[in-house]
Amino acid sequence: MSKQLIYSGKAKDIYTTEDENLIISTYKDQATAFNGVKKEQIAGKGVLNNQISSFIFEKLNAAGVATHFVEKLSDTEQLNKKVKIIPLEVVLRNYTAGSFSKRFGVDEGIALETPIVEFYYKNDDLDDPFINDEHVKFLQIADDQQIAYLKEEARRINELLKVWFAEIGLKLIDFKLEFGFDKDGKIILADEFSPDNCRLWDADGNHMDKDVFRRGLGELTDVYEIVWEKLQELK
């Protein structure tokens, strides 16, 4: 399968394929935090992220969620549907943590009565600012119907993920999703789902996600390996 690099990101390289509607995503060993300010090469990270994300996306596909995932090609590669990415990070929070706790001056780990969905404008130059529905419409990123769909789909995905992670003894604190338009103009889930873009805590409150790297709490791949081993316990 011939391929040509079309995009190089912080965590993945994206390549063309012989099919104009398909791409290959290659996961890197690079870890970044604070929008790339903190950066490090960590051997084995790409393999673990690809394993975890492929596993989660397969389960989401089976549960009826429309995603870009087609198949896992190798240890670090997966085949995806090509999408036009919507420049929004869709963040869903089940508990207070991270920037939410800083913004509102509250402790981390407080359960939210209703999960909160937030939007962040994907723009590195602006440091991905927190925006609301009206900003999304002003920037012509999405209309009312599309905004409602993104929120509804994030909540639906959350209900699935919460159950799966609870089954393996992990609490899903929050996560970031990205969506895009497929060749037919349908909004589908894209990017990845791994400890890079979610927060997971174990029963003792230990971080099982990229906060280990952000906050210097230990070896990132050790934690990701534990998450991967636990996920394989799911039926």
Curated annotation (Swiss-Prot):
Pathway: Purine metabolism; IMP biosynthesis via de novo pathway; 5-amino-1-(5-phospho-D-ribosyl)imidazole-4-carboxamide from 5-amino-1-(5-phospho-D-ribosyl)imidazole-4-carboxylate: step 1/2. It catalyses: 5-amino-1-(5-phospho-D-ribosyl)imidazole-4-carboxylate + L-aspartate + ATP = (2S)-2-[5-amino-1-(5-phospho-beta-D-ribosyl)imidazole-4-carboxamido]succinate + ADP + phosphate + 2 H(+). It comes from the Bacteria. It holds the Pfam family SAICAR_synt. Keywords: ATP-binding, Ligase, Nucleotide-binding, Purine biosynthesis. It is an enzyme of class 6 (ligase). Its EC number is 6.3.2.6. GO terms for molecular function: ATP binding; phosphoribosylaminoimidazolesuccinocarboxamide synthase activity. One of its GO terms (biological process) is 'de novo' IMP biosynthetic process. InterPro entries: SAICAR_synt/ADE2_N (IPR028923), SAICAR_synt_PurC (IPR033934), SAICAR_synth (IPR001636), SAICAR_synthetase (IPR050089), SAICAR_synthetase_CS (IPR018236). Gene3D superfamilies: ATP-grasp fold, B domain (3.30.470.20), Phosphorylase Kinase, domain 1 (3.30.200.20). NCBIfam families: purC. HAMAP family: SAICAR_synth. Belongs to the SAICAR synthetase family. PANTHER family: MULTIFUNCTIONAL PROTEIN ADE2, SI:DKEY-6E2.2. This is Phosphoribosylaminoimidazole-succinocarboxamide synthase. It comes from Streptococcus pneumoniae serotype 2 (strain D39 / NCTC 7466).
